[in-house]
UniProtKB/Swiss-Prot annotation:
Its EC number is 2.7.2.3. GO terms for biological process: gluconeogenesis; glycolytic process. This is Phosphoglycerate kinase. It is found in: Cytoplasm. Coiled coil: none annotated.
Length: 392
């Protein structure tokens, strides 16, 4: 992927506009998790350390375009960013009428981009208005890279220079390494409740990987495709044929979709449900599969330890309940111990990594939910395509 990087730009004496993803959650009016703000600090600090002034823009929540309500205000985000930087970060509400006059070292924030008319429709005039504020535009919002919007795509077309921020460049380099020229053997884990939501990812990865591990409700549908009885487990009967095709595709190239031979079942989906380990052939009609069994977990762990590239999206069991967390824990630890380059993404996956305390042992943890999935599907990400075009 050919794109310019912020860290290769001379920003001395320039105004840099950074599109960040600081869409943080709030609880009782306070920021409850500042991970996204902290993730954006590297680009802001690079600019400040190299003599630039910085304008940050982000979206927050899902406001109605053209309307402004108190809950849409980015002021708490600006205040938090200021606290982390040790600076006063002012919010600019009327930046179109009053273009800011900034000095090196200044940091300001534009009001929530999603209240601007034309933002979601990728309005070119709005993109030009953003671009008119800066000498250099930086996209550091990988989490929104799959959306063509004025603050991610149109602005990149119109700005004097458009480049990828530290976070964005890191994401793209890691994803490129994992998917464009992977070291082999390559293993992917795709898990979740439904095949339907991950079907295009499964099909796309089946072309690339040597082993395709499936988990959760997805694995149940594949077990059905193998003719196994799964009791009252969550599955999609209408996607059994698609599952058979994916298994045939993997087998034809000497790979496989290794399915569990033993499972952990319960009579109910509940935190206090009794967990029973069973051979896959012994699952009763009134039982549901909520995790893979210890034999299956050990076999899959061996596959992961022997891999050179691992792409991971989704836990293989209901890991929120400890009695059904064994499979996900075993695979998480195997990935952490493996010599493979590993990349993980998706909210549940990140929660599992945090729960089992291996955050520092995963090669790369992607910050983009939808963008990560669309990259796995092989789709073009509009905001990235815009950067690549400007990098030519």
């Amino acid at each position: 992927m050919a794109f310019l990087k912020l860290t290769e730009q001379n920003v001395q004496g320039k105004t840099v506009l950074i599109r960040a993803d600081m869409n943080v959650p709030f609880k009782d009016g306070k920021i409850s998790d500042d991970t996204r703000i902290r993730a954006s600090l590297a680009s802001v600090k690079y600019c400040l350390d190299n003599g630039a002034s910085v304008i940050v823009m982000t979206h927050l929540g899902r406001p109605t375009e053209g309307e402004f309500h108190p809950e849409d205000d980015v002021a708490p985000v600006a205040a938090h960013l200021g606290g982390l930087l040790g600076k006063d970060v002012k919010v600019l509400n009327d930046w179109r009428e009053n273009k800011p006059a900034l000095n090196a070292g200044d940091v300001v924030m534009l009001q929530n981009v999603r209240i601007n008319k034309g933002e979601k429709k990728n309005d070119l005039e709005l993109g030009k208005a953003y671009a008119s504020l800066c000498d250099v535009f930086v996209n550091d919002a990988f989490g929104t890279a799959h959306r063509a919007q004025a603050s991610t795509e149109a602005v990149a077309q119109a700005a004097p220079v458009a480049c990828a921020g530290v976070l964005m460049a890191g994401e793209l380099d890691a994803l490129g390494k994992a998917l464009k020229q992977p070291a082999r053997p390559m293993v992917a884990i795709v898990a979740g409740s439904k095949v339907s939501t991950k079907l295009t990812i499964l099909e796309s990865l089946a072309d690339k990987v040597d082993q395709l591990i499936v988990g959760g409700g997805i694995a149940n549908t594949f077990l059905l495709a193998e003719g196994k009885a799964i009791g009252k487990s969550l599955a999609e009967h209408d996607l059994v044929e698609e599952s058979k095709k994916i298994m045939a595709k993997m087998a034809a190239k000497g790979g496989s979709v290794p399915l569990p031979t033993d499972v952990v079942v319960a009579k109910a989906f509940a935190a206090d449900a009794e967990a029973v380990v069973k051979d896959i052939a012994d699952v009763a009609e009134d039982e549901m599969i909520l995790d893979i069994g210890p034999k299956s977990a050990a076999a899959l762990a061996d596959l992961l330890k022997a891999a050179d590239t691992v792409v991971w999206n989704g836990p293989v069991g209901v890991f929120e309940f400890d009695q059904f967390a064994g499979g996900t824990k075993a695979l998480t630890e195997a990935i952490a111990q493996s010599k493979a380059f590993s990349i993980a993404g998706g909210g549940d996956t990140l929660a599992a990594i945090a729960k089992f305390g291996v955050t520092d042992q995963i090669g790369y943890i992607s910050t983009g939910g939808g963008a990560f999935l669309e990259f796995l599907e092989g789709k073009e990400l509009p905001a990235v395509a815009a950067l690549e075009k400007r990098g030519e």
